[in-house]
């Protein structure tokens, strides 16, 4: 098999990275994708750094054994902790994801920018460096959201539980003064509709899925690694939990409008 026809690997701590996979498949509909969700060990956002690194390397080795031509680390926490180490150890294009703060700043709406993310993403140096770029000019507030990925891993993406969680998190803010909400975890796009409801649709909601997918396409194109086949690509999903329910949930989220 030529490198062009090899699949693209996607990895996340659970089902969250499927939000990025959806965007990538729209952008690259002829490509085959292999997705590995580590739901057995989710969430990563509250684990120790060394544990996240070990789990990320295990997942990458699994996907490499399947013959992938590129890897998307569709997990903010794993990206912030491990991306440099991965690039040093594997000789394929590796694309990470980080909170889409730049697009939020470029909107220039003048209000508060809230960054929802896991505690570990917000604690890492990579995030501190990102904040340093804008902290002098922007009103930016990190909002740690522990427990939210776990709910989404259970397939709870709407209803009273999610509404009440978000209502509690945003109770300290004046919705009129929020310009943008940056979704700094790939699980969060699945609760976007409820987030709009809680904030009365006042803020722009931004996630990094499109930017990451566009970067994937750019790197593959520049390396002449895009498939040359004129066909519809396919998506195959694996999960460390190895039970039918999590695979069914994964495909359900992938097909969610």
UniProtKB/Swiss-Prot annotation:
Binding-site residues, substrate: 12-13, 44-45, 76-77, 186-187
Catalytic class of the enzyme: isomerase
SUPFAM superfamilies: Aspartate/glutamate racemase
Pfam family, one: Asp_Glu_race
A GO BP annotation: cell wall organization
Entry-linked InterPro entries: Asp/Glu/hydantoin_racemase, Asp/Glu_race, Asp/Glu_racemase_AS_1, Asp/Glu_racemase_AS_2, Glu_race
EC numbers for this chain: 5.1.1.3
Active site feature: 75 (proton donor/acceptor), 185 (proton donor/acceptor)
Pathway it works in: Cell wall biogenesis; peptidoglycan biosynthesis
Record keywords, A-Z: Cell shape, Cell wall biogenesis/degradation, Isomerase, Peptidoglycan synthesis
Domain of life: Bacteria
Family per similarity comment: Belongs to the aspartate/glutamate racemases family.
Name of the protein in its database record: Glutamate racemase
UniProt organism field: Clostridium botulinum (strain Hall / ATCC 3502 / NCTC 13319 / Type A)
